[in-house]
């Protein structure tokens, strides 16, 4: 067909290519009791791009500001009609945040002489397509039936620093972590699974708006993709750095975690550390273990390895609000700054509920490769 666009592949900024391969998922250490429930399994994973670091406060703040500005433009009536006659936000229109029309963005009460955002109105709307339902329908219904609309509050829950730790003074983190420049390059926390997924849809929309050819969506990694990437090509490696130890030859810790009872700061960070702290693994990925645990797209099922497919393995379920709580569990991987070393192992599984926010859970995005291999482009 003539006049087809020339596809030269993509190389997204801040992402590294994870080549396709085969990986032996499951516990790498001699966890006999755990093996009874979660049996090891060999699977194949397609190639993909992955953020080399966790999403930082600075990166997530771009999303929050985009939502803030879109609301401000809406309140100001800054629209124009495109070539199809549809209304679009006029992003070139100047914004005056002192104008009376946009004061709904702020709370009436000031704190320390500053205006405070009304975070409850910072909402992002997007649509998803239910591919499983559409495949099961076999074309009998209109595709419109399978689109689902979502409205998600995007402002991080800064109160997690207080709520997660009773009888503990963490108010300075609640006040400053998401906004102070000192924490710009630290991983964003206080985001639930829905917020992390919404960030991916916004990022995809932003990418496609400035590129002639649309790409695949930026999304959360599946559990299998995360484990494969964390291992860095090292088969049966218990940690991303390969060896069975959490300290190097000099006795220095190799990740940000809790090495002993009541011992948080030995690695140099009482809480989180910058997203590019410590050495990357052999794929070039930082902090795949430690710092913050990370959301995956996968639903948590205890014995998933006994029934998942051996190609691009995944368990996907869209839990509704009225579903049983157990159905709302999503796999988190990597362990965090407040966890012991067991949770840092590449084969260790854990979960959080999809609608909960934590001070120790963040995320990063992946992008599926289009084509056979990145080396083809």
What are these regions (language model features)?
Residues 1-13, 229:
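Bacterial Sec-dependent N-terminal signal peptides
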Residues 3-5, 37, 317-320, 349-354:
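Short, P/G- and charge-enriched loop/turn segments at secondary-structure junctions
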Residues 9-176, 184-195, 290:
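A short glycine-rich, aromatic-capped structural motif
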Residues 17-18, 24, 29, 127-346, ...:
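Functional-site microenvironments in short loops/helix caps that host divalent-cation chemistry
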Residues 33-35, 302-304, 353-354:
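A short local loop/turn or secondary-structure capping micro-motif enriched for an aromatic residue
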Residues 39-41, 282-284, 354:
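Short, surface-exposed beta-strand/loop micro-motifs that present aromatic residues
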Residues 359-375:
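Short, structured beta-strand segments at or near domain termini in extracellular proteins/domains
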């Amino acid at each position: 067909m003539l006049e087809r666009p020339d596809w030269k592949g993509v190389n997204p900024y801040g992402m590294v290519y994870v080549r396709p391969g085969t990986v032996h998922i499951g516990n790498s250490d001699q966890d006999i009791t755990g093996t009874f429930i979660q049996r090891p399994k060999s699977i194949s994973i397609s190639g993909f791009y992955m953020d080399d670091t966790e999403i930082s406060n600075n990166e997530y703040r771009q999303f929050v500001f985009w939502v803030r500005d879109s609301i401000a433009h809406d309140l100001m009536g800054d629209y124009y009609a495109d070539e199809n006659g549809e209304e679009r936000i006029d992003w070139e229109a100047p914004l005056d945040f002192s104008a009376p029309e946009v004061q709904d963005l702020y709370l009436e009460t000031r704190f320390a002489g500053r205006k405070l955002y009304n975070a409850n109105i910072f909402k992002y709307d997007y649509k998803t397509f239910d591919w499983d339902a559409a495949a099961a329908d076999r074309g009998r219904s209109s595709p419109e039936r399978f689109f689902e609309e979502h409205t998600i509050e995007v402002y991080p829950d800064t109160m997690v620093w207080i709520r997660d730790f009773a009888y503990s003074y963490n108010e300075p983190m609640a006040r400053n972590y998401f906004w102070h420049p000192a924490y710009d390059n630290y991983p964003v926390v206080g985001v639930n699974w829905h917020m992390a997924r919404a960030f991916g849809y916004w990022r995809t929309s932003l990418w496609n708006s400035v590129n002639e050819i649309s790409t695949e969506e930026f999304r959360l990694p599946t559990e299998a993709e995360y484990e494969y990437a964390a291992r860095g090509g090292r088969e049966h490696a218990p940690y991303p750095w390969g060896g069975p130890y959490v300290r190097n030859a000099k006795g220095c810790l190799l990740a940000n975690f809790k090495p002993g009872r009541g011992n948080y700061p030995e690695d140099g960070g009482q809480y989180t550390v910058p997203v590019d702290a410590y050495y990357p693994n052999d794929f070039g990925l930082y902090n795949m273990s430690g710092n913050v645990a990370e959301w995956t797209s996968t639903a948590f099922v205890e014995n998933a390895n006994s029934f998942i497919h051996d190609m691009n393995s995944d368990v996907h379920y869209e839990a509704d609000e009225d579903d049983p709580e157990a159905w709302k569990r999503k796999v988190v991987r990597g362990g965090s700054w407040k966890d012991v070393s067991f949770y840092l192992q590449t084969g260790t599984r854990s979960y959080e509920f999809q609608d909960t926010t934590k001070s120790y859970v963040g995320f990063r995005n992946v992008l599926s490769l289009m084509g056979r291999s990145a080396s083809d482009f």
